[in-house]
Amino acid sequence: MRDIFIFSAIICIVLAALRKPQVGILGWLWLSIMNPHKESYGWIYSLPILDIIAGATLLSAVINFKQAKKALFHPIAIILLIFYLWTCLSTLFAISYDLAFPRWLDHTKTMMFVCLMLLFLNSRYWIISAIWVFVFSVGYTGVKGGIFTLLTGGGARIWGASGTAWGDNNGVSLAMLMVIPLIFALKELLDRKILRLGIYGSALLAFVTILGTQSRGGLVGILGSGLVFFIRTKHKFSIGILIILTGLAVLAFMPDSWKGRMQTINTYEEDRSASTRILQWKYAVQLASESPIIGNGFYARYHQPFYQKYMVGIDVNRAVHSVFFQILEEQGYGGLFLYLLLMVLAMVSANRVAKKAINRPDLKWAGTLLYYSQFSIAGFAFNGLTINVGYIDLYYYILAFVVLLISHINIELAKPISENTNQKSLGK
C-alpha cells in the first residue's frame, strides 16, 4: 500500500513537472531530503525515482524556459559558482579519479538543482512553497524523533532517513539545527493561534531530537547557534534566561548515559573517539600539504599510498570528522578560503538585508525567513566542526533560499511605494 501511494505521488509530480518545472524542483527537494521510498521495503525501494524526477524537471526546464524568473545577481551566487568550478578543477587533478568522480557527480547534481532553484523559484509563492517542503521533509524526522526521545527518556539514539546524507545520528542533529530556525520563521505566515502553537511544538520536538541523537557535535551546534542568536538578538536578558532554563531542563531530563557522553568533550585525551578525530585532523593537514592550492580531490584520504605514508601504525583510515578539514584536504587552502568566504558572506548578507525588510508589512515574512536562515548556517558551521558533511545538499539548499529571499526583497524595495501598496491590496 505504501509503495502504491509513493509511486502515485511520483507520477503526479512528473506529470505536473512537465508543465511547470517548479513542481519538479519541489518534488526533488522532497524526495532527495526525505527519501520516502526508503521507508518502504517493497518494489519501489530500489526504483531510481530521483533520476525520474530529475529527467522530467530538466526536460520541462528546457521546454518551459520562458517561465524562468532569475534571481538578481548577488555575490553569494557567484562565489558558490566559483567554488563549484574549483571542485571541478580539483577533480580534474585528483590524486585518485576513481575515488573523486562519483562524489563529484553527486555534488554536481546538487548544484544543478540549486541553479534550477535560482532560475525558477524567484517569486513569493514558490519561495514559500520550497521552504515549506524543506521544513516538512526534515521536520518529519524531528517530530517523530522528538516524540520517541520523550517516550524512551532519551535512552536511545535517533537515526535519520535511510539512504540520505543525514541518515546517522550526527547527520540528524545537523539537519535539526538547520531546520529549527526556519520552523520558527514560518510562524509569520500563519494567522491562527493553533497553527502557531503547532510550529512551536514542532520546533521543540526537533530540539529534543537533537538531544536524542546523543551527538556531541549536536551539543556543539546547539551551543554555537545559541551564542550567535544571543549576540544578534536585542532581547539578551530574556533570551539568556531562556537558555539557562533550557540547559537546566536538559540536565534534569536526559539520562546519565547522555551526560557521560557529552562530558567526554572536555576529556578528549581519555576518549578514544575524540582523540581519533584529532589524529584525523592532523592527517587532513598532511594531505593538504601534498597539493596545498587546489587540493587532492574528493575522498583523497582513502587513497592508500597517502594512508601508508601518514597513518600506518598510528590509526585506521577513518573519516575526517570535520567539514573544514574535509574541504582543506580535498579542495586545498584555496577551496577552504572560498568555502569560508561563502559561509560568512551568506550570514552577513542575510542579517543585513533582513533588517531592511523586517519592518515592511508586505516583506516581513521574507525578512523573518532571511533573518533566521543565518542561524541555520551557524548551526551547520558549529556542528560541522565535528562531522564531515561539507557537500551535504541541505546546506546548499539553505544558501539558495538566502539568495532567493535577498533577490525578492531587493526587487520589492526597488519598486515605488505606490506599486507595492497596489500589489498588497491585490494580494500579490
Regions found by a protein language model. Give the residues of each.
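Hydrophobic transmembrane alpha-helices and their immediate junctions
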Residues: 226, 231, 331-376, 401-402, ...
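Juxtamembrane membrane-interface segments at transmembrane alpha-helix termini
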Residues: 37-46, 90-93, 114-121, 141-150, ...
